Amino acid sequence: MNKNMSIVGVPMDLGADRRGVDMGPSAIRYAGVVARLEKMGFNIEDRGDIFVTLPHHFTETENHKYLDEVVEANEKLANVVSDIMTAGRFPLVLGGDHSIALGTIAGVAKHVKNLGVICLDAHGDLNTGATSPSGNIHGMPLAASLGYGHERLTNIGGYTPKVKAENVVIIGARDLDQGERELIKRIGMKVFTMHEIDKLGMARVMDEAIAHVSKNTDGVHLSLDLDGLDPHDAPGVGTPVIGGISYREGHVSLEMLADADILCSAEFVEVNPILDRENMTARVAVALMSSVFGDKLL
C-alpha cells in the first residue's frame, strides 16, 4: 500500500434528490480521518475541497438533472486526481454523492491502463438518461465510466471508456432498476447481490471478487457507497435500502482487500450528516477506511 496519500473532498449534492450529502466531506474529516490515517503511518496531504458551482435554478437536460454543474465539478476532480497520481500518491476522495465517481475514475484510469473497479453499493449506478426513473446522475457513474450514456458524462477526462465490464465487480446490490438489470445481463458484469452474500458468506464472495477484478488489471479502484451497508449501521445516507451489508461484513470485506494489496485509489461517498445520528455514518466510514488501509488488531 502506498503510504503517501492525498485526500480531496467533493461537496456535491446535485447528483441526488436529497440535500445534505454535500456536507459529507466535512463530516468525515470531523470524524477524524486524517488523525486515524496518520496514526497508521500514512503521510497525509489534504488538498481541501473541489469547488462545486451551485445552480441559480433547477435544470434538466435529456433526463439529466444539473448536467452542466455535475460535469464541471467532475472535470475538475478528474484533473486533481490525475495530478495526485502523477505525484505518485494514493488518491482518497470523499463525497459527496456518487456522481463524483465520474471524475475519480476518469482521473485514475488515465494512469492505470487496465483499471479494475470494486463497488460496494446497494445500487448498480448503471442507469443512463434513457433508463433512469429519476434523472439523478448519482445513479449513472458506473454506466458512464463503461461508455454508456450521455456523451458529456462518458467523455469526462477527454476519453471513453474508462473501464471494461469484465474488470468491474459490484458487491451488496439489492436495488436495481429494470434498465440496470438488462445492462448487467447484456454485458455480463459480475454482481454479488445480498442473496449471494447471505448464501455464500462475505469471505467467499470477496475471494471470488478479488480474484475476478485482479485477473487482468494493473490496479483496482474502490468505490464505496455507504448505502451499501445496512441502514442500521449507516443511517446517514440518502437512499437507504434495508437488508444490507452488516458492519462486520463491511470490515471483513475491506480487510481482505487490504490483504490483497491491489488498490490504487478509493472513494467513500453518500455520507449525509442531515440524515445521520451523531455523525455515526461518517465515523463508520472512517473505521472502514482504517480496515481497507491495513489497520490490524494484532
UniProtKB/Swiss-Prot annotation:
Mn(2+) 1 binds at residues 98, 121, 125, 225. GO terms for biological process: arginine catabolic process to ornithine; urea cycle. It catalyses: L-arginine + H2O = urea + L-ornithine. CDD domains: Arginase. InterPro entries: Arginase (IPR014033), Ureohydrolase (IPR006035), Ureohydrolase_dom_sf (IPR023696), Ureohydrolase_Mn_BS (IPR020855). Binds 2 manganese ions per subunit. Keywords: Arginine metabolism, Hydrolase, Manganese, Metal-binding. Mn(2+) 2 binds at residues 121, 123, 225, 227. Substrate binds at residues 123-127, 134-136, 177, 239, 270. It comes from the Bacteria. Its EC number is 3.5.3.1. One of its GO terms (cellular component) is cytoplasm. It is an enzyme of class 3 (hydrolase). Pathway: Nitrogen metabolism; urea cycle; L-ornithine and urea from L-arginine: step 1/1. Its cofactor is Mn(2+). It holds the Pfam family Arginase. One of its GO terms (molecular function) is arginase activity. Belongs to the arginase family. NCBIfam families: rocF_arginase. This is Arginase. It comes from Brevibacillus brevis (Bacillus brevis).
